[in-house]
């Protein structure tokens, strides 16, 4: 059992005898009483999204899942294909299962494939990935390092903010939890 206050985006739980992935978990505290944890849960089986509120202190059942090392191969638009590193078996996941994760997948990236009852249900990305900037504004005289940033589009379609010194074609490190620029690669 896991305390609802410890729920994070990407966690897998069992709620009302069905497995869900936590899409969002926000804590709200009232002036006096106990807090409230508002969550958005996506059913792994049906793909439907539920909004559920829990009282702080409640516990939910953690899903019995297993992780296996895999390599991302390719996607055909509808499915994303992965190969297990130990047995070379190939598995696919529907595109709708990989909401934000698809923006970090590059060919041959190693990920953890998440299995529930012997079937792949999702992936866990590494914390940091290296992506190439394909579109950003050029530098202008007067741009400073401490002066904020500029929008950039990365090779996977992810849009993020980068410092002014980053140029088109450069590789950068991106945090997969937040989508934020970390440093040049």
UniProtKB/Swiss-Prot annotation:
SUPFAM superfamilies: Nucleic acid-binding proteins, Translation proteins SH3-like domain
Entry GO terms, CC: cytoplasm
GO terms for biological process, alphabetical: peptide biosynthetic process
Subcellular location field: Cytoplasm
Alphabetized UniProt keyword annotations: Cytoplasm, Elongation factor, Protein biosynthesis
Presence of keyword Iron: no
Pathway assigned to this chain's UniProt record: Protein biosynthesis; polypeptide chain elongation
Pfam families: EFP (PF01132), EFP_N (PF08207), Elong-fact-P_C (PF09285)
InterPro entries: Elong-fact-P_C, NA-bd_OB-fold, Rib_uL2_dom2, Transl_elong_fac_P/YeiP, Transl_elong_KOW-like, Transl_elong_P/YeiP_cen, Transl_elong_P/YeiP_CS, Transl_elongation_fac_P
Keyword Cytoplasm: yes
Record function comment: Involved in peptide bond synthesis. Stimulates efficient translation and peptide-bond synthesis on native or reconstituted 70S ribosomes in vitro. Probably functions indirectly by altering the affinity of the ribosome for aminoacyl-tRNA, thus increasing their reactivity as acceptors for peptidyl transferase.
Family note: Belongs to the elongation factor P family.
The protein, known as: Elongation factor P
Species assigned in the record: Petrotoga mobilis (strain DSM 10674 / SJ95)
Lineage per the UniProt record: Bacteria, Thermotogati, Thermotogota, Thermotogae, Petrotogales
